[in-house]
């Protein structure tokens, strides 16, 4: 079954690891030798690393081998005889997630705490998913009715998986976003964890004390919980201004975190990268420990400035929450911006408009475009301002000031919009 599963899904790291360990186990049994899981795991890792050295930096490789390592090293610390199989499953889940914590935070920047319970419920059901799916394939050739029963059973089980995951993701605290820790933090975490494992196994050979085992279990749990909290604090305690210009190809996206801790995004889109919000902007925000953006500014309605923001708005339940979407003045809105505003409202995000002279927080001020709304005067002149066309020349211009540091965020400002900004005198202040 494992071989055919590998053929069907392709040579994924986890499948290759399972297949190689299975062959080593079978070889040991055929030759009459004892099966040594740590040796089997090490040999498999060596074979795959020789085949593809870059696997050592691959998240899938590290997660697959880390899960088995957690069962081999950490689970014995929690292992105590009990009649409750569910409790045993929880301890295995805790051991696996504890070993994978550093990898999860480094590559995915967050921890799903309810996964401890979900694994206890869902993993035991996986053999039934496999059996009903394979049964549906085999029996569909003999009897269409029997095949449909197998497929429907498999579909119901997978639907149960989806519903349960959706339910837990909607619960408070379903995601702990910590940001990406430094590599030294990951090394220290695994150093402490492996030291505790070594100490436990060394003492276990000398004495079998349940109190000591319980103490080690508690200590490991404290290390895991403390590491999550510590990583989150390290990524959110900076009091300095942070400005990051993201590489989104042909497009624009700028992230700002001011001294007060407010997080803002100015534009977010690309014309040559697909799903830029999902695969470029959101992962960056999570890597910085950003759970919520106070403001998302849109300078104008071109696709290479807004399509990523649209993805962020629609994925707030699973991604980064947006408090307020800030758009150009109403007289400069086009159909794309109005559509974006509707998406924001549908996803319970406030929609604001910003005008020249208004501030967002302490450090960000809008200086363009000028509008009739406030009857701005151009250097004291009373003549009516020229009408700008919605789009590039009416781009929102933001001024970022922090002490001696100044930065202009101009969108795609051009033509009469540039002339108006220069004549307004806003650049002289």
Which sequence ranges carry the predicted segments?
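A generic short alpha-helical patch detector that favors 3-5-residue windows
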Residues: 38-39, 94, 126-127, 273, ...
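Hydrophobic alpha-helical transmembrane segments in multi-pass membrane proteins
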Residues: 1-116, 181-236, 419
